[in-house]
């Protein structure tokens, strides 16, 4: 996926691991030795499909005591759900991990405090975990 990150943006780059990055532009940045970093324009063009568009996602909401879960993106590799919590909610699935990125607010998980931009991982074998507080987070699962 060709993309850029501009000043002042916060992104959550949730993707299948590929271990490949092709740099098509680098803003003149330099490495530790002062050299410009290599660009990979030809390689990037070889593997890019510029005609493909993502399917539109019709967000689905599940309202529970203490919060609202909204599925914002799903594909064969992962699902991303936004959680808006104002109380205590159960998070976690028995068949997959849950990666949590807190976007706003604060809360606790098992007595441990978390806040804006904190990230934590709930293993599949943890079962349901209680999150408490007033916060917004992205939950990523397989």
Which stretches of residues belong to each language-model region?
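Glycine- and acidic-residue-biased ligand/ion/polar-headgroup-sensing regions
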Residues: 8, 82-112, 116
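Short acidic-glycine-tyrosine-enriched beta hairpin
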Residues: 1-2, 109-128
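Short, glycine-/Ser/Thr-/acidic-enriched flexible segments
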Residues: 19, 88, 104-107, 127, ...
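Conserved hydrophobic/aromatic beta-strand scaffold that supports enzyme active sites
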Residues: 2, 11-13, 59, 80-82, ...
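A short hydrophobic beta-strand segment most commonly corresponding to one strand
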Residues: 4, 8-29, 134-142
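C-terminal amphipathic alpha-helical segment
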Residues: 22-88, 93-94
């Amino acid at each position: 996926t060709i993309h850029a990150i501009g000043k002042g943006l916060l992104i959550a780059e949730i993707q299948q691991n590929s271990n490949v990055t092709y740099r098509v532009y680098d803003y003149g940045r330099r490495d530790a030795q002062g050299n410009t970093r290599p660009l990979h324009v030809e390689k990037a063009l070889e593997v890019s499909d510029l005609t493909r568009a993502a399917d539109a996602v019709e967000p689905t909401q599940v309202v529970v005591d203490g919060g609202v879960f909204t599925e914002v993106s799903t594909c064969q590799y992962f699902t991303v759900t936004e959680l808006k919590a104002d109380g205590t909610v159960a998070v976690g699935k028995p068949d997959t991990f849950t990666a949590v990125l807190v976007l706003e607010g604060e809360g606790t998980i098992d007595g441990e405090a978390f806040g804006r931009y904190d990230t934590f991982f709930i293993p599949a074998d943890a079962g349901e975990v209680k999150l408490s507080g007033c916060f917004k987070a992205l939950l990523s699962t397989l």
